[in-house]
A protein has these predicted regions:
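Shared catalytic-loop signature of beta/alpha-barrel
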Residues: 29, 56, 72, 86, ...
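Conserved, mostly hydrophobic/aromatic
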Residues: 3, 33, 58, 97, ...
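Metal- or metallocofactor-binding catalytic centers and their adjacent structured scaffolds
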Residues: 29-109
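Ligand-binding pocket scaffold of soluble enzyme catalytic domains
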Residues: 30-32, 37, 108, 126-127, ...
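Structured beta-strand/loop patches that form or line metal/cofactor-binding pockets in enzymes
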Residues: 1-37, 41-44, 345-351, 400-403
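Extended hydrophobic packing segments that form well-structured cores
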Residues: 373-403
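Metal-dependent enolase-superfamily TIM-barrel catalytic cores that perform enediolate-based chemistry
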Residues: 124, 129-253, 257
Length: 403
């Protein structure tokens, strides 16, 4: 079996836009006509540049080769351009292509990928969702001034609704804006709002749901500890990425100073970056994103390292349903799995992109028994929703926010 063709799509994500403004998908085809799908959690370049990078990577290291040779593909791509170091853009390409290879491998074997990675540990996977506005766009620049992101009453109402639907864990991120400049001290207004938001949600859901407190590296260690003290009384399940991800030694200072478990990993890639998190004691919950972390096999290795240190894994997902499907395949095999990020109930445009919806029941994702990744991308929907813009998937404020 050899890979003979690669094709990419940059697909626009219509309102409400859960998962980002667009998704980047790839299809690999073998000489026997078997196809596999993958997806990148976008890199540091525009989406069409990234799509071309995926094609270039495939043409260099996969076309004409056997998709079973995952380790060889990873090593060649990891060493591309004389680098041999974690490169988030290259690993986004590798991750997309590697999961497409696994999709092919599973289809050829007639088995779900989880059956080829040690077998199924979990019949159902506990899931959580962010709190999203009920109507209109979810992007912060488009929402009304008063919304679930900044109003305790609306957040509590939304959380209670999700619990009624079956979720037993919800996430919010009210801790203030992100800046390209380094971590800062939170403003008192941000600490106060965060505490009021978490308090309102706790009062609304009681003990029926865990609360996941999301941040994205906004703070210094001391600033993060000030925030942690304010929300500790409401017993969040985790405090996510309290400081920038480049210095796990600093994150470890936060971990030692709070009773809230620290979670991190969506901006990390490969076993080498995650090893530093584990070795320094920076987090007890890892959040690899399979569209960036190096692929399914690489993330299985990350999870094994974590297991040896009694660290749990909670796969991250803020993109399209192919990364979601890959997360499900891996999570089903992990003894140290904690919880899975869902984009609500995998409905809306995520459902339209697939020929068969990801199954969600009573707060859990149910792993598919179909071969490969267990889902099939609807290529006609991809073709009907091209994205022509140049925006980055996510971005930070380019200027200092608190001069």
């Amino acid at each position: 079996m050899k890979i003979t063709d690669v094709k990419t799509w940059v697909v626009g994500n219509p309102p409400p836009g859960i998962g980002g403004k667009y998704f980047i998908f790839v299809r690999l085809t073998t000489d026997g006509g078997v196809v596999g799908y993958g997806e990148a959690y976008n890199a540091t370049f525009g989406p069409h540049v990234t799509a071309r990078m995926i094609e270039d990577c495939a043409e260099r290291y996969l076309v004409g080769r056997d998709p079973h040779d995952i380790e060889t593909f990873f090593r060649r791509a990891y060493s591309s351009g004389f680098t041999q170091r974690p490169d988030v853009s290259m690993m986004g390409c590798v991750s997309a292509l590697e999961m497409a290879c696994w999709d092919i491998i599973g289809k050829e074997a007639g088995k779900p990928v989880y059956k080829l990675l040690g077998g199924q540990v979990h019949e159902a996977l506990r899931s959580y969702t962010y709190l999203y506005p009920h109507e209109g766009s979810v992007h912060t620049e488009d929402v009304a001034p008063k919304n679930v992101y900044n109003d305790p009453d609306l957040a509590a109402e939304c959380a209670a609704l999700y619990v009624e639907q079956g979720f037993n864990a919800v996430k919010l991120d009210p801790a203030g804006p992100y800046t390209a400049f380094d971590g800062h001290q939170p403003r008192l207004i941000d600490i106060d709002l965060s505490a009021r938001m978490v308090k309102a949600i706790r009062e609304a859901v009681g003990t029926k749901a865990d609360i996941l407190f999301g941040t994205h590296g906004q703070f210094t260690a001391s600033g993060a500890l000030r925030m942690a003290r304010a929300i500790e009384p409401f017993d969040p399940l985790w405090f996510e990425e309290p400081v920038p991800p480049d210095m796990p030694e600093v994150m470890a200072q936060v971990a030692r100073g709070t009773s809230i478990p620290i979670a991190t990993g969506e901006r990390l890639t490969t076993k080498w970056e995650f090893a530093r998190v584990i070795e320094t004691g920076a987090a007890t919950i890892l959040q690899p994103d399979l569209g960036r972390s190096g692929g399914i096999l690489e993330t299985k290795k990350i999870a094994a390292m974590a297991e040896a240190h009694h660290v749990q894994v909670a796969p991250h997902c803020y993109c399209g349903p192919i990364v979601g499907a890959a997360n499900i395949q891996l999570a089903a095999t992990l003894p140290n799995f904690l919880i899975l990020e869902s984009l609500k109930q995998w409905d809306g445009f995520h459902e339209k992109l697939l020929k068969k919806k990801i199954e969600w029941q009573d707060g859990n994702v149910i792993p598919s028994k179909e071969p490969g990744l267990g889902v099939e991308l609807d290529e006609a929907v991809c073709e009907a929703h091209p994205y022509s813009g140049k925006a980055l998937h996510l971005h930070m404020a380019p200027d200092p926010l608190f001069p």
